[in-house]
Amino acid sequence: MTKKAKNVEKVPFEDAMKRLEEIIDLMNQPTTSLEASLALYEEADQLMRICESRIQEVEARIKQLSDQRSES
C-alpha cells in the first residue's frame, strides 16, 4: 500500500466526505486536465471504499447493540 493510501485510511469519515465533494467540484471544472482527473478519480475511489467500510462497521455495531437490547 502506498503512503498516500495509508494516509487516506486515517481520514475521518466527515473529512473524507468533504474531500469527495471537493473532488467532484474539481472534476467538473473544464480546466482540469485528463491526467489530473484520473488522479482525482483514483483518490475518490479510495475515499469511497473507506467510507463504505466505515458505514458497514457502524451498521454492524448498531445491529449488535440492537440485538443485545432485544435479548435483555
From Swiss-Prot:
Pfam families associated with the record: Exonuc_VII_S
Compartments (UniProt record): Cytoplasm
Disulphide bridges, residue numbers: none
Any one Gene Ontology BP term: DNA catabolic process
One GO location term (cellular component): cytosol
A GO term, aspect molecular function: exodeoxyribonuclease VII activity
Name of the protein described by the UniProt record: Exodeoxyribonuclease 7 small subunit
